[in-house]
Amino acid sequence: MSYIAIVDYGAGNLMSVHNTLDYLGYENKIAASADVIENAAGVILPGVGAFPDAMAALEHSGLTEAVLKAAKEKPFLGICLGMQMMVIEFGRNVLGYSDANSVEMDNKTAHNVIDLMEDQKNITNMGGTM
């Protein structure tokens, strides 16, 4: 039976995504190993926190290669920081902007691939990207 893999790298709200997919009737598995990601019909990359910490957690989990491969080959959804990680990775490795980043994380880079919404630029106590 096919399922959706929810990537468990220590920086995402896994149970919220898992419970939502269960409620909607989608088979899903928490993926803490590459084989669960590789055998999935689709992949969700949730994320919370700061980009450098999340990327370090993903690398430490040993799932980076499986996640990158899945993003190229399967339906793939990044949620919150997970989506930002995907866009920044695209900016760095496809567009060739080695300093690609989100303006929230590095407002000095010449290549902000994720910007703040105009009406939220003065809000400092919450995320307001895109």
Protein language model features and the residues they cover:
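N-terminal beta1-alpha1 cap of cysteine-dependent amidohydrolase-like domains
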Residues: 1-130
